[in-house]
Amino acid sequence: MKQNKINKKFVYLISPNKIPDINFYDDLALVLSSKKISFFQLRLKKETNLNKLIIGKKIKKICNKHKVKFLINDDPLLAKKLNADGCHLGQKDMDLIKARKILKNKIIGVTCHNSINLAKKAINDGADYLAFGAFYATKTKTVKYRASLTVLKSIKKITSLPIVAIGGIKLSNYKKLLLNKANFLAISGYIWNNKKYKPLEAIRKLK
């Protein structure tokens, strides 16, 4: 996976925890049409595998239309079934080496929290990108680890892999992460749960 410099497609969009209604797919298409998004990750922790498959098929078509890479959270087998572009692995998910056997040359990213040691292991195991966070407080998931801006500078000294920043990213703080060398920003709540802006308006504010 090629590393992006700061550009207009720095958003790594994550789905809401639950697909709210049928209108979500229209909102997603509008957001992806903004041309600010490189990746979309389907993250539905509480859905059945069957529902994930049904939802994933719909979303994959939308991602393909807008040339956005479609990734699955935690589940390499589902990613293979959907012929997704790859998957994202947390530290408690399937081992990266096992996931690579399933997904071959697909994109596999790994959560590294705030740890350079976890990042080094992921690099050695063949990760395509590294994710650090949470950088800020977030309501999307329970935060067990907080990351500092210094980890972004430190990781850049040892790898050229793309770096994804995660956690509580919104209009008031996103530029600081880009200026500190994050290649992509994983964003969810700011887009889907924004009380001030609709999804398309919210994504357009990120310039």
Swiss-Prot record:
GO terms for cellular component: cytoplasm. 2-[(2R,5Z)-2-carboxy-4-methylthiazol-5(2H)-ylidene]ethyl phosphate binds at residues 138-140, 168. GO terms for molecular function: magnesium ion binding; thiamine-phosphate diphosphorylase activity. It holds the Pfam family TMP-TENI. GO terms for biological process: thiamine biosynthetic process; thiamine diphosphate biosynthetic process. Its EC number is 2.5.1.3. Pathway: Cofactor biosynthesis; thiamine diphosphate biosynthesis; thiamine phosphate from 4-amino-2-methyl-5-diphosphomethylpyrimidine and 4-methyl-5-(2-phosphoethyl)-thiazole: step 1/1. Binds 1 Mg(2+) ion per subunit. 4-amino-2-methyl-5-(diphosphooxymethyl)pyrimidine binds at residues 41-45, 73, 111, 141. It comes from the Bacteria. Keywords: Magnesium, Metal-binding, Thiamine biosynthesis, Transferase. It catalyses: 2-[(2R,5Z)-2-carboxy-4-methylthiazol-5(2H)-ylidene]ethyl phosphate + 4-amino-2-methyl-5-(diphosphooxymethyl)pyrimidine + 2 H(+) = thiamine phosphate + CO2 + diphosphate; 2-(2-carboxy-4-methylthiazol-5-yl)ethyl phosphate + 4-amino-2-methyl-5-(diphosphooxymethyl)pyrimidine + 2 H(+) = thiamine phosphate + CO2 + diphosphate; 4-methyl-5-(2-phosphooxyethyl)-thiazole + 4-amino-2-methyl-5-(diphosphooxymethyl)pyrimidine + H(+) = thiamine phosphate + diphosphate. Its cofactor is Mg(2+). Mg(2+) binds at residues 74, 93. The keyword Repeat does not apply. It is an enzyme of class 2 (transferase). InterPro entries: Aldolase_TIM (IPR013785), ThiamineP_synth_sf (IPR036206), ThiamineP_synth_TenI (IPR022998), TMP_synthase (IPR034291). SUPFAM superfamilies: Thiamin phosphate synthase. Condenses 4-methyl-5-(beta-hydroxyethyl)thiazole monophosphate (THZ-P) and 2-methyl-4-amino-5-hydroxymethyl pyrimidine pyrophosphate (HMP-PP) to form thiamine monophosphate (TMP). Belongs to the thiamine-phosphate synthase family. This is Thiamine-phosphate synthase. It comes from Pelagibacter ubique (strain HTCC1062).
